[in-house]
Amino acid sequence: NLTMKKWTILLLALLCSTAGAAAQDFSVVNPRCEYRDEPLGINTLTPRFSWQISARDRGFLQSAYELIVGDDRAAVAAGRGNLWRVKAKGAESLHIPYAGKALESGKEYYWSVRVWNAAGEVSPWMPVNRFSTGLMSPDAWSGARWIAMEVQPDSLRLVPGEEYNKLTIGDRITAPNRLPQFRREIDVRKPVKRAMAYVSGLGQFEFFINGDKVGDNFLDPAWSDYDKIVCYVPFDVTDRLQQGANVLGVMLGNGMYNV
């Protein structure tokens, strides 16, 4: 009868509402790729993924997960990964190794994950997270060259000597060179979808675009044995470039050469 149908519809609505609420009671948070949130220039083509779960109830147990990786943000946001999709049972959420199609150097990728609880309820997809690979092959650096300050004839500048603890250091000393600075102008005439800068310096450097320092790091890059390896730092400069003229600048420091 009509009354029974109303109660049936109401019961179904309550069940659907309860199931939807239960799925929202837990979610994936704190995503990490190679221990970092949205890392730039990772030095591996088999990155590892980790995450945590925020749940209303104590004692939450993850029973399964589904992880996707792709090169299109919109597709991953819609739950589609064209490079890798894995679904596995278990509570693993640390260091899940990538095992999909081969990744390429210097490209940006996107990933997301969702999990199930012990009752078989599934969380929403995690907000899309990104990572980019570094320049890991020698060919990727084929167009790069070292830039150095030219030695000037008057590079040896003499200044008056000083006394320290009443001991004369000398009549003359050699003053150090000023910090070398390099600049280059580029012209941007089309909309920029993505722009990366990979910068290295023997010693330390600071990188500038249009007069503003890029990044908040200090004493880049990491020290290394320059006879064996030289480190570099990746910067996402997509939002730094403007239409028209742009000025790129680098200021160098002695770094380990001053030790």
Feature-to-residue mapping (PLM):
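Surface-exposed loops/turns
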Residues: N43-T44, G100, S105-G106, Q242-Q243
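Pro/Thr/Ser/Gly-rich low-complexity, intrinsically disordered linker/stalk tracts
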Residues: A23-R58, V128-W141
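An acidic-aromatic loop/edge-strand motif
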Residues: G134-R172, M251-V259
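Exposed beta-strand and adjacent loop surfaces of beta-rich binding modules
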Residues: N30, R48, Q62-E66, R194, ...
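Positively charged n-region of N-terminal signal peptides that target proteins for export
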Residues: N1-W7
